[in-house]
């Protein structure tokens, strides 16, 4: 369903394009051998090149090139065998060279696509305009001293992939889905860790609005360096409504760069939006054009892992899962692997229900990650086995799972220790059934008179009297025979 904002003069739609800066996983920077470890002491991972010392020549890091190509292939994009690095000229204190080495009109990766997984199980394709490599800038720190700012150049020269979408997104929710899917692909490819809280994935959102039915692309504003998916969505929503208010009051939108204030939930003007000519792009004279062989690309392609879309299709075909469940499970590589371990040789639907239900809930409740879960895949699989062989009822299994989260013990151990084994002894179950029937003659008569839904109530009473240990199927069968004959 289309996302429409109702204004005073009519209905409006949002047009959104996203630029994502993804920090490349590499032990060294794009043009120097300095380390890239997050959280190091300020200015301890800086080479003369990163600090902009005169006469220092950049040397391309082949690993970063491989990572860019790998990402491009993961986005089903065209790999350009010849690309050019250009100088993007601007002054800022944390850019000691006085320019950023980037790529302009000849990027390493051309057009591609990304498939959004929609909440209703459907999909939508978003175009990728390009991916190019560039240096990150340093970091300005303004909150360490009341009257001074400090510069940390550890980040200066770190390799970034700027991934630019086409203006195909139409709602804050779609923007969130796009970022979630892109982060998933990058993590599967192991080209970026996607940790937005550490700044290794940052987003600029380009936002404009137009009347519903129009195909015109109106003036856009760019919201810079938003560092969480939720904030990106909030920023887009606010900015779109600001545009509509301006248009409906007879004004015009000025193309500009804006910042998002996450405390106030609003954007504010940062500077007028620069155009390409403002940066005086020209090919970097210290770097030859980057020429790669098709065999280099083919070698990387042959080593690509199974990506989320392919894994989702396989989960649907192999395990019989619906599109939504498969999409949730493959969103993170670790959750897909966890599910496959649990489901191996077992009822895949039951495995899916347990992983997406109780197990995911336990992660939220304990604050643990799937890499260090409160219940291992092996133990969850064993719990499913105990349900299947009749040792545990569904209700007892829930209790055992809670104990597994609490103690970390295997389900078989807990069943033995706590005497939680399901009662399948006919004599014991029959005694419990007889007791409930004899205590409720009025309800027995109602069942005989046709109110068969009450059989469920009788089952509940028997389960209660046996502390959930009776086999529900045996209880149901016995009640039906004894009451209805």
Curated annotation (Swiss-Prot):
Instruction: Check the record and name the SUPFAM superfamilies matching this protein.
Output: GatB/YqeY motif (SSF89095), Glutamine synthetase/guanido kinase (SSF55931)
Q: Which residues cross the membrane?
A: none
Q: Does the keyword Protein biosynthesis apply?
A: yes
Entry's Gene Ontology molecular function annotations? asparaginyl-tRNA synthase (glutamine-hydrolyzing) activity; ATP binding; glutaminyl-tRNA synthase (glutamine-hydrolyzing) activity
Q: Which reaction does it catalyse?
A: L-glutamyl-tRNA(Gln) + L-glutamine + ATP + H2O = L-glutaminyl-tRNA(Gln) + L-glutamate + ADP + phosphate + H(+); L-aspartyl-tRNA(Asn) + L-glutamine + ATP + H2O = L-asparaginyl-tRNA(Asn) + L-glutamate + ADP + phosphate + 2 H(+)
Query: What would be one Pfam family of this protein?
Result: GatB_Yqey
> GO:BP terms for this protein?
glutaminyl-tRNAGln biosynthesis via transamidation; translation
The record's EC number reads 6.3.5.-
Which UniProt key words apply to this protein? Answer: ATP-binding, Ligase, Nucleotide-binding, Protein biosynthesis
Subunit record text:
Heterotrimer of A, B and C subunits.
NCBIfam families, sorted: gatB, PRK05477.1-2, PRK05477.1-4, PRK05477.1-5
Question: Cross-referenced HAMAP family, in alphabetical order?
Answer: GatB (MF_00121)
Q: What does this protein do?
A: Allows the formation of correctly charged Asn-tRNA(Asn) or Gln-tRNA(Gln) through the transamidation of misacylated Asp-tRNA(Asn) or Glu-tRNA(Gln) in organisms which lack either or both of asparaginyl-tRNA or glutaminyl-tRNA synthetases. The reaction takes place in the presence of glutamine and ATP through an activated phospho-Asp-tRNA(Asn) or phospho-Glu-tRNA(Gln).
- The family this protein is said to belong to: Belongs to the GatB/GatE family. GatB subfamily.
Q: What is this protein called?
A: Aspartyl/glutamyl-tRNA(Asn/Gln) amidotransferase subunit B
Organism the protein comes from:
Paramagnetospirillum magneticum (strain ATCC 700264 / AMB-1) (Magnetospirillum magneticum)
